[in-house]
Amino acid sequence: MKIFHLAFTVKDLDSTRQFYGELLGCQEGRSTDTWIDFNFFGHQLSLHVGEVIQRSKTNSKVDDISVPMPHYGCVIEWGVFYDLVAKLQSKGMTFIVDPCVRFEGRPGEQATMFFEDYSGNALEFKAYRNPEEVFTS
């Protein structure tokens, strides 16, 4: 697997450590007083303190589900997805899109959920029932 790098802004490092480190369980990497790296499910996430990018007032539709734009996230294994759902629900997470299955019974069937980090950045986590169908139409 090739590691993907994503960098964006957050409002502060304390709440960012709490969300990504404690809540999501991501291992912290290097940091300074203005940025922090996390192992985000095998990928490098670099979070920098600054003005947070505002979400669009216009959402997009995917399989008749309205999804926030922009958003980022990770494709994880089916079982890991449902373990994460249980963990987030036990912590009282408010979902933008509740955990659900899209494209059910069709190629690319996927479990998905959307929620915000503590800076208001929209995240999507999803899992494909058949991972080999990630790019299948």
Residue map of PLM features:
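N-terminal beta-strand motif that seeds the catalytic metal site of vicinal oxygen chelate
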Residues: 1-14, 71-72, 76, 127-137
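Short glycine-enriched loop/turn motifs at secondary-structure junctions
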Residues: 1-2, 65-69, 106-107
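Core segments of cupin and vicinal oxygen chelate
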Residues: 9-52
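Short, conserved charged micro-motifs
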Residues: 15-16, 79-84
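Short connector loops at helix/strand junctions that flank enzyme active sites
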Residues: 33, 40-42, 66-69, 90
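A short local loop/turn or secondary-structure capping micro-motif enriched for an aromatic residue
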Residues: 46-47, 53-57, 131-134
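Helix-adjacent hinge/juxtasegments
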Residues: 60-75
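Vicinal oxygen chelate
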Residues: 85-137
